[in-house]
């Protein structure tokens, strides 16, 4: 069934139909389309535009269509142009002329705008659940590793000692912001376009506020032309999804590095690893690599959406049909990555002894050694130079700062005393950092309590 054709004298070319149809992908939101139609006819009956008898018949028919699609007895085919015409054709077939009244006071332009918003809202909620699940795993890691010392890095060079809890906490902050972005998008987009018509509203006395309320929106949109052509919320969503993917990619990159024989910080669980067809010894972190690789795919969706929108005049244009496949793919990709990443991280084994040894052997306590001198009256710039000389001495003798004798310390500066060893121990270096946001256990415990309250809110 076509929703148009009265003014045409020729049948649609099959190639044109194949190129023009969207049901092969917009069938994904058949549930949202039916939900929108149920709300629409409920409002029409309330306003006296539709009889209660027709309303009840239409709603019953729509629910039966949804049920039959759900259980597989009704197959969606590409004979229809889109999911809207498929549902309407099946409705008319089931209930007769009453079904022809479904589209009263409505255009496919505001209908698809509604469907896309309903679908996007549902997917934001599902993505948020996955993000929350990841945060719960990261929070458990933080609680269990408050005293797991490791090197912190700048320029991929060992810099200062931190804890695994603190390092994981940095990613917690990223994914925490991601949840905030999704919530912000959901709030801003939560206005109902239904009732905007093709672009100029309708002459029917629709109650748009009532329809918006039925569908869980905060209210109706305020400009009908913008309502049918607005895809800002998709651009914002794709930007947020790209940011989530980027955060997953950064963490995946570190896991790949940590898993290498050169680092040996982590051991991947067998269930989240793959092997080689030729090298029997290989155990590859391919899930982390695929997550890293799929990030570009999500970025591509964002750039495609921006490009689609950049030259479209008001109001609705067929170009907007291109918003769906790329949005669907980006959402599915990020959700899949979140699910796999959470499982991968929750099953990894951290080699705590290797991490602490790496921190000790990388001069990560050099800054604390300089601070020791400053606390004994040496100007910081002079202290910096003194510790630099000690580091050079250690490099030449293949030692860590902790391995130097007191005589060797004093050979560079007489200020050093026996308490230097306690001052540069990994435990002291980390635990004396107690300001909010620092790696010390006391500071971390306060932050963890904040996170717990947020997750349980």
Stretch-by-stretch model annotation:
Residues 117, 121-124, 128, 143, ...:
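Charged, flexible cofactor/metal-binding loops and thiol motifs
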Residues 40, 61-68, 90, 94, ...:
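Generic, well-ordered alpha-helical scaffold segments in large soluble proteins
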Residues 53-54, 151, 221, 382, ...:
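A generic structural-conservation signal
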Residues 42-50, 163-166, 235-243, 368-377:
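Short, well-ordered beta-strand elements within core beta-sheets of diverse protein domains
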Residues 1-36, 97-98, 279-457:
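Glycine-rich cofactor/substrate-binding loops
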């Amino acid at each position: 069934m076509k929703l148009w054709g009265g003014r045409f004298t020729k049948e649609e070319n099959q190639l044109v139909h194949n190129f023009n149809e969207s049901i092969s992908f917009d069938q994904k939101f058949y549930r949202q389309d039916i939900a929108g139609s149920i709300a629409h006819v409920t409002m029409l009956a309330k306003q006296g535009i539709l009889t209660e008898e027709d309303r009840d018949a239409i709603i019953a028919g729509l629910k039966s269509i949804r049920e039959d699609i759900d259980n597989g007895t009704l197959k969606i085919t590409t004979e229809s142009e889109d999911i809207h015409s498929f549902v309407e054709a099946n409705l008319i077939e089931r209930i007769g002329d009453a079904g022809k009244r479904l589209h009263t006071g409505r255009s496919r332009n505001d209908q698809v705008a509604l469907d896309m918003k309903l679908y996007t809202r549902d997917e934001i909620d599902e993505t948020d659940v996955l993000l929350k699940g990841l945060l719960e795993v990261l929070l458990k890691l933080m609680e269990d590793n408050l005293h797991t010392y490791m090197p912190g890095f700048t320029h991929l060079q060992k810099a200062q000692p931190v804890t695994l809890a603190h390092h994981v906490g940095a990613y917690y902050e990223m994914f925490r912001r991601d949840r905030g972005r999704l919530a912000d998008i959901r709030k801003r987009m939560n206005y109902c376009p239904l009732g905007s018509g093709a672009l100029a509203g309708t002459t029917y006395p629709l109650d748009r506020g009532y329809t918006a309320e039925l569908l869980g929106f905060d209210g109706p949109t305020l400009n009908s032309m913008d309502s049918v052509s607005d895809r800002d919320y998709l651009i914002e969503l794709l930007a947020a999804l790209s940011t989530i993917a980027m955060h997953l990619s950064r963490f995946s990159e570190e896991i790949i590095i940590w898993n290498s024989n050169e680092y040996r910080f982590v051991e991947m669980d067998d269930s989240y690893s793959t092997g080689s067809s030729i090298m029997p010894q290989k155990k590859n972190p391919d899930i982390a690599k695929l997550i890293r690789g799929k990030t570009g795919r999500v970025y591509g969706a964002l750039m495609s959406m921006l490009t689609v929108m950049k030259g479209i005049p008001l109001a609705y244009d067929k170009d907007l049909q291109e918003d769906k496949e790329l949005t669907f793919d980006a959402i599915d990709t990020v959700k899949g990555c979140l699910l796999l990443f959470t499982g991968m991280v929750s099953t990894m084994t951290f080699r705590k002894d290797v991490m602490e040894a790496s921190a000790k052997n990388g001069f990560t306590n050099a800054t604390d050694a300089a601070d020791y001198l400053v606390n004994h009256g040496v100007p910081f710039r002079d202290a910096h130079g003194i510790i630099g000389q000690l580091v050079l001495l250690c490099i030449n003798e293949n030692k860590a700062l902790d391995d130097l004798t007191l005589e060797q310390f004093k050979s560079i500066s007489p200020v050093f005393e026996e308490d230097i060893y306690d001052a540069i121990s990994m435990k002291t270096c980390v635990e004396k950092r107690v300001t909010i946001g620092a790696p010390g256990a006391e500071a971390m415990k306060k932050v963890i309590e904040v996170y717990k309250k947020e997750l349980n809110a």
